[in-house]
Swiss-Prot record:
Protein's name according to its UniProt entry: Teratocarcinoma-derived growth factor
Organism in which the protein naturally occurs: Mus musculus (Mouse)
Purpose: GPI-anchored cell membrane protein involved in Nodal signaling. Cell-associated CRIPTO acts as a Nodal coreceptor in cis. Shedding of CRIPTO by Tmem8a modulates Nodal signaling by allowing soluble CRIPTO to act as a Nodal coreceptor on other cells. Could play a role in the determination of the epiblastic cells that subsequently give rise to the mesoderm.
BP GO annotations: anterior/posterior axis specification; anterior/posterior axis specification, embryo; cardiac muscle cell differentiation; cell differentiation; fibroblast proliferation; gastrulation; heart development; in utero embryonic development
CDD domains xref list: EGF_CA
Membrane topology: Lipid-anchor; GPI-anchor
GO molecular function, one term: coreceptor activity
Gene Ontology cellular component list: cell surface; cytoplasm; extracellular region; extracellular space; Golgi apparatus; nucleus; perinuclear region of cytoplasm; plasma membrane
Length: 171
């Protein structure tokens, strides 16, 4: 955790002890009846209290070496990464994770099922899509290499394309 100067610590202690707060018609006053009139109500909200910075900084404005890909630097050494990035410095992009030679997000028929490369893993649907599979899926845990055992017919290709479009609408 960062260190605060003695003047900052003193200011926080004084503001807490005397409960400084904004007063209607004035910039800053001590909450004491001798300083402001009872006719002017005090506008006191806890959100106006002095709160020291916790060190959350935008990497674009201060520390460009802390976080990559638009991440937000926290306490000088941790990053809050935007969607699809991860790692200590937001250096990894999940959209670029492929399944071997298959690109991320690609759909392909694989041994009676329809599979998709997603975040570096090949995920296969449990339904059968190819003819000749007798209602069951063979080998769901497939590797990304290789080719399908048979070439799908035109009807099957259109059915697969429709399923892909339907599933892409859900994601």
């Amino acid at each position: 955790m960062g260190y605060f100067s003695s003047s900052v610590v003193l200011l926080v202690a004084i503001s807490s002890a005397f409960e400084f707060g904004p007063v209607a018609g004035r910039d800053l006053a001590i909450r004491d009846n001798s300083i402001w009139d009872q006719k002017e109500p005090a506008v006191r909200d806890r959100s106006f209290q002095f709160v020291p910075s916790v060190g959350i900084q935008n990497s674009k404005s201060l520390n460009k070496t802390c976080c990559l890909n638009g991440g937000t630097c926290i306490l000088g050494s941790f990053c809050a990464c935007p969607p699809s990035f991860y790692g200590r410095n937001c250096e990894h992009d999940v959209r670029k994770e492929h399944c071997g030679s298959i690109l991320h997000g690609t759909w392909l028929p694989k041994k009676c099922s329809l599979c998709r490369c997603w975040h570096g893993q090949l995920h296969c649907l449990p339904q059968t899509f190819l003819p000749g599979c007798d209602g069951h899926v063979m080998d769901q845990d497939l590797k990304a290499s290789g080719t399908p055992c048979q070439t799908p017919s035109v009807t099957t290709t259109f059915m697969l394309a429709g399923a892909c479009l339907f599933l892409d609408m859900k994601v």
